[in-house]
């Protein structure tokens, strides 16, 4: 799709620099006509800026890693919005199980809850499938201005989110979380 308006589709590819940017990981996506020379040049460029290339072999909305992230994010939002689990408990479980520095809700706060909502709306506009709509509870957070890190409040309060506190992973301070 990115090359649709370009006369030389063999010279086009798409890059998605990951957040947080200090991860130095970039997803690169070819189209059906990206030439071998362009692929080699793209990979050489990413290596020259000390980024790790993750290759998506052909075009797909959202790249590969973001599609996997979307499935996780969508299910986490559903579990929260339908009252099955507290976001902090789900983040604790995720962080303990996969040894990460933050969980899905912490990551959504980093990305920005308005951005999370807009991405879900983009999928809905393309599919027309109501299951692609963001949950109303997320819409309400965005309407209140609770956008995550950038606004100081989202699923956590910033600049010192609960998941960085000593003992938080063990459930200490749970009653203070609200």
Residue ranges and their predicted role:
Residues 5-7, 11-14, 20, 33-41, ...:
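NAD(P)-dependent Rossmann-like dehydrogenase/reductase catalytic/cofactor-binding core
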Residues 22-24:
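Gly-rich Lys/Arg/Thr-decorated short loops/hinges at beta-loop-alpha junctions or inter-strand turns
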Residues 27-30:
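Short, surface-exposed amphipathic charged segments that create phosphate/polyanion-binding patches used
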Residues 33, 69-75:
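Structural/interface elements that position substrates and couple domains in central-metabolism enzymes
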Residues 77-79:
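C-terminal alpha-helical interaction appendages
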């Amino acid at each position: 799709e990115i090359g649709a308006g370009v006369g030389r589709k063999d010279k086009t590819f798409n890059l998605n620099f990951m957040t947080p940017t200090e991860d130095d990981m970039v997803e690169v996506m070819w189209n059906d006509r990206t030439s071998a020379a362009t692929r080699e040049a793209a990979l050489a460029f990413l290596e020259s800026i000390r980024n790790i290339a993750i290759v998506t072999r052909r075009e797909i909305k959202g790249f590969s890693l973001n599609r996997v992230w979307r499935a996780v994010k969508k299910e986490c939002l559903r579990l929260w919005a339908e009252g099955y689990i507290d976001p902090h408990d789900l983040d604790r479980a995720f962080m303990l199980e996969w040894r990460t520095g933050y969980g899905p809700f912490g990551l959504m706060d980093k990305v920005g809850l308005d951005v999370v909502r807009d991405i879900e709306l983009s999928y809905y506009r393309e599919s027309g499938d109501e299951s692609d709509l963001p949950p109303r509870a997320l819409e309400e957070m965005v309407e209140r201005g609770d956008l995550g890190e950038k606004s100081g409040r989202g699923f956590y309060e910033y600049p010192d989110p609960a998941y960085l506190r000593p003992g938080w992973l063990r459930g200490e301070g749970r009653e203070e979380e609200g």
